[in-house]
Amino acid sequence: LPPDAFMLRSLLFAAAFYAITGLMLVGLSWLLLAPRYWAMAGLKLHARIATWLLHVIVGTKMEVRGRENLPEGPVLVVAKHQSTWDTFALIPLFDDPAIILKDELKWIPFYGWFCVKFEHILVKRDKAAVALKAMVADAKDRVADGRQVLIFPEGTRTAPGAPPDYKPGYLALYDALAVPCVPVALNSGLFWPRRKFMRYPGTIVVSFLPPVPPGLPRKVAKERIESALEAESRSLIAEARMDSPTAPFSNSEK
């Protein structure tokens, strides 16, 4: 497709995505007064609509691999974070996820109110030691309720293939929660790049990797989790570029 076609599709998707997001946040605000699982159903509906719009307008599909590696019940999910896409599209893959997010998000009208309603784990980043202790305590509560705790251990979106910068918070959770830890690799940043307007056609792959059992020494757990994430992420990026060697994303992120 010519560059103008990618721009037009990206523009149409952005208009549709933000329109449906705004309409659902306001239109479903009554769910703030309903049971939490009703609100979670609304969140998953939004995610499914958004991924459908991306497929229909841009041509970006979603493929999930390794679902059998996700145990039932409480689990710690440690996922790569390359794109805004990750923050909504992963949600329907879990039964009742509690996502670790920055505390400032709760002040955003409607969106922040729903974050509180979902009992996501909101972390204040200005006081690291206090924030870490509070995060672990909140995560223990969510696990006790049978929920899945989802953390993006790099703390921010990272370009595909960029050197990783894992923060130690996920290891504190691994030690404290005593539940299986499932690494999740993906290649979303190739198709929905960070800090860029363009969206590209292709297949975003989400790969659930074999769980790391609880109770391992921290150094061993760190090596197993991070090496698995990096190896699978590199493989997914290489696979996408091999499948579409002339695609615009091939030179969009280095």
What is each of the regions a protein language model found here?
Residues 25-44, 48, 55-57, 72-128:
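Catalytic core of membrane glycerolipid acyltransferases/transacylases, capturing the structured
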Residues 66-70:
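Glycine-rich helix-loop-beta junction characteristic of Rossmann-like nucleotide cofactor-binding loops
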Residues 64, 121-124, 214:
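Short acidic-hydrophobic, aromatic-tinged amphipathic segments that line or gate anion-handling sites
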Residues 3-4, 132-254:
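Non-catalytic C-terminal accessory region of glycerolipid acyltransferases
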Residues 64, 77, 99-100, 206-208:
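Generic preference for hydrophobic
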Residues 4-25:
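Alpha-helical bilayer-embedded segments of polytopic membrane proteins, i.e.
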Residues 58-60, 64:
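Membrane-helix interfacial anchor on the cytosolic side
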